[in-house]
Amino acid sequence: MTETSISGLRGPKSMYFMEIVDVSSQESSVLSSIVESFTSAVSASNLGVYSDEVLCDIKSSLKENSPITMLPNYNVSPTGDEHGQYLVIDLGGSTLRIAVVDISKPHPNLSRSERITIVVEKSWIIGNDFKRIDGEFFKYIGSKINEILMGQNVIDVKSVINTGITWSFPLETTDYNRGKIKHVSKGYTVGEDIYDKDLKMVLEDTLRQEYGLTLDVQSILNDSLAVYSAGCFIDSKMKLAMVLGTGINMCCSLKRSSDIHPSKMLADATLFNCELSLFGQNLCKDFATKYDIIIDKRFAGLSHHFKTFMEPDPITKTLFQPHELMTSGRYLPELTRLVVVDLIEAGEIFQNVDHQQMYQEYGGFSGELICFVHENDDYDDIHDKLCKAYGWTTVGLSDIVCLKEVVSCIIKRAAFIVANAIIAFFKLLGSDELGGDVTIGYVGSVLNYFHKYRRLIVEYVNSAEEAKGIKVDLKLIENSSIIGAAIGAAYHK
């Protein structure tokens, strides 16, 4: 195939796109087989079959009391009447955020979102050498709370301070505003003085002893539950909350049912942290490629020795997360890199440039780059982006066309898998809960920046027979960990 340098094509767009069509028509058999391996099972008609299989696993998790998926939490179903002033603490993996939020009373001239005012908000980076949750850590949090409260006049610091928390670590939940600190993640450890202590009591005692402040923790949520809390207040049509960034998760509210294990029902309605990443085992046979197997060899086990949604792998003692591995921002770039390396070896791409960086695991192709290539239809811009990323002076047009084809098929499969999960949850919720316009609230860098990925998910869902009579939209719930915690506190006050 004759190589064409894109640097010679900076002319009128009509001529330029004509040239692109000519190049793409020379698609290689290797590329064709790769595209086929990612997309052969992707069709709207298949959503019914595969969503039924995911639904079956979700129901098993609920019925058999899975300890790692469909985790129960106290329900938050805002009515829109919630109001008041709240202190919010949001502890994530590397950031502490503290805010004061004012939710005004319902007013005919104000939408629900317009009633929410973040009076003050400040964040602090938590360094790796400070990631020990002990008494001193809570004193540090207390000092930042005091700093925030002393710099505002919305909350009366001499009165009881209603507080909401977004806590991005596991808790042994004992009530809607109580949970024991036992296990952490994201590089943190727990001090002996805090282990098995109640988060509400530790925080309230620290602020009272150190600063004479009286906090009343009304609600404790994790990040996915906070999306649901904030989203349901802002949009009464919201039925699901989704996180899709470096990982994937969903959250939904379910009514009491004989199909749900009694231990998972905390009240007449329970909010479930679904841990969606652990589902999707049924998709391995028809959707997994050799590249997925390179990332996690368990994709090759068509008859797995365990249920991914019920327990860790008994052999490796690690979790297997099929949904996350095929859809999330951590793995989409690595899948792309692995395919590109195969095409390099086959002599199909990047033959006239230094491609050694492509051989670097989890670094040879960045998330920013896959997003740029997928979202951008200006081949000049993609050319310049690739040259800047890899230190090239030029890159062939056929290379760019091939790369876009690779990225497109990987994103197409990912969008189908996410849509399939949404359909499964629609079936779980049932027709009584759904109808007309339905909103799915979301957060996460992938859905926020991959606009075409997001649109493709919506198109798949809305074209499915199982979603007949429903029109789905994905809605970004901005600042959900702050707003959701405030709404949670207002709901339970």
Swiss-Prot record:
One of its GO terms (molecular function) is mannokinase activity. Residues 79-221 are annotated as: Hexokinase small subdomain. Disruption phenotype: Greatly retards the growth of cells using GlcNAc as the sole carbon source, increases resistance against farnesol, and attenuates the virulence in a mouse systemic infection model. Leads to derepression of opaque specific gene expression, as well as to constitutive filamentous growth and hyperfilamentation in filamentation-inducing conditions. Pathway: Carbohydrate metabolism; hexose metabolism; Carbohydrate degradation; glycolysis; D-glyceraldehyde 3-phosphate and glycerone phosphate from D-glucose: step 1/4. GO terms for cellular component: cytosol; mitochondrion; nucleus. Keywords: ATP-binding, Cell wall biogenesis/degradation, Cytoplasm, Glycolysis, Kinase, Mitochondrion, Nucleotide-binding, Nucleus, Transferase, Virulence. SUPFAM superfamilies: Actin-like ATPase domain. One of its GO terms (biological process) is biological process involved in interaction with host. It catalyses: N-acetyl-D-glucosamine + ATP = N-acetyl-D-glucosamine 6-phosphate + ADP + H(+); D-mannose + ATP = D-mannose 6-phosphate + ADP + H(+); D-glucose + ATP = D-glucose 6-phosphate + ADP + H(+); D-glucosamine + ATP = D-glucosamine 6-phosphate + ADP + H(+). Pfam families: Hexokinase_1, Hexokinase_2. Its EC number is 2.7.1.59, 2.7.1.1. PROSITE patterns: HEXOKINASE_2 (PS51748). InterPro entries: ATPase_NBD (IPR043129), Hexokinase (IPR001312), Hexokinase_C (IPR022673), Hexokinase_N (IPR022672). It is found in: Cytoplasm; Nucleus; Mitochondrion. It comes from the Eukaryota. Induction: Expression is induced by N-acetylglucosamine (GlcNAc), by the alpha pheromone, and in filamentation-inducing media. Residues 27-490 form the Hexokinase domain. Residues 222-479 are annotated as: Hexokinase large subdomain. Gene3D superfamilies: 3.30.420.40, 3.40.367.20. Component of the N-acetylglucosamine catabolic cascade that phosphorylates N-acetylglucosamine (GlcNAc), and allows the unique ability to utilise GlcNAc as carbon source. Converts GlcNAc to GlcNAc-6-P. Also able to phosphorylate glucose, glucosamine (GlcN), and mannose. Galactose, fructose, N-acetylmannosamine (ManNAc), mannosamine (ManN), galactosamine (GalN), and N-acetylgalactosamine (GalNAc) are not phosphorylated by HXK1. GlcNAc metabolism is closely associated with virulence and morphogenesis, and is involved in the cell wall synthesis. Interacts with histone deacetylase SIR2 under filamentation-inducing conditions. Belongs to the hexokinase family. This is N-acetylglucosamine kinase 1. The gene is HXK1.
